[in-house]
């Protein structure tokens, strides 16, 4: 049996990125194509993208991308969100099934605004309030992980090669004025199991 390191390079690393200097939005398929040329620099254990300007219709709201282990955890997290934010829209993040990306958690997206009364009572500015809420979810709700929480941007990450992750998340259906991509070992992606436990 081959062991890790004989099949993949555990310390693989690949990066790519670009920005539209004139602000025009570029289809996400371009960043997927760009990082695919770095395939041999990745190890298949983690890939991700960040797109900026991808949610123009919700550009003034925070876009939370969240992994869940179960629907029970999702419901618990949504109660927390309802207490601390006005939820403008929520949905599963659209994916394209592929045999190259497996064992995915539940993946949801929320467009939210912090409740003004909560910000006032916290005596924090808006960004600090949002950051603390994200940290609270990630540290205190077991089985939930907020992996993206900015305005008019989104992170898309998974266990796999970057080009497969881009296909999985259907990045060809997004447009943004800036894109980054990486391929590497997923050192900070709780919520996604490489192998399903039986």
For each of these PLM feature ranges, what is it?
Residues 1-198:
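N-terminal segments that mediate ammonia production and transfer
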């Amino acid at each position: 049996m081959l062991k890790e390191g004989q099949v993949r390079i555990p310390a693989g690393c690949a990066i790519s990125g670009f920005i539209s200097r004139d602000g025009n939005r570029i289809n996400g398929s371009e960043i997927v194509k760009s990082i695919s040329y770095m395939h041999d620099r990745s190890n298949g254990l983690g890939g991700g993208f960040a797109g900026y300007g991808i949610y123009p219709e919700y550009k003034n709201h925070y876009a939370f991308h969240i992994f869940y282990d179960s629907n029970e955890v999702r419901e618990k997290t949504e109660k927390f969100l309802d207490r601390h934010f006005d939820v403008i829209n929520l949905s599963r993040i659209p994916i394209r099934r592929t045999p190259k990306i497996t064992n995915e958690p539940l993946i949801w997206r929320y467009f939210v605004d912090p409740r003004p009364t909560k910000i006032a009572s916290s005596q924090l500015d808006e960004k600090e309030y949002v950051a603390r809420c994200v940290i609270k979810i990630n540290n205190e709700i077991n089985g939930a992980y907020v992996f993206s929480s900015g305005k008019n941007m989104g992170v898309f990450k998974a266990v796999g090669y970057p080009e497969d992750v881009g296909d999985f998340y259907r990045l060809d259906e997004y447009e943004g004025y800036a894109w980054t991509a990486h391929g590497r070992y997923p050192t900070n992606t709780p919520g996604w199991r490489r192998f399903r436990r039986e």
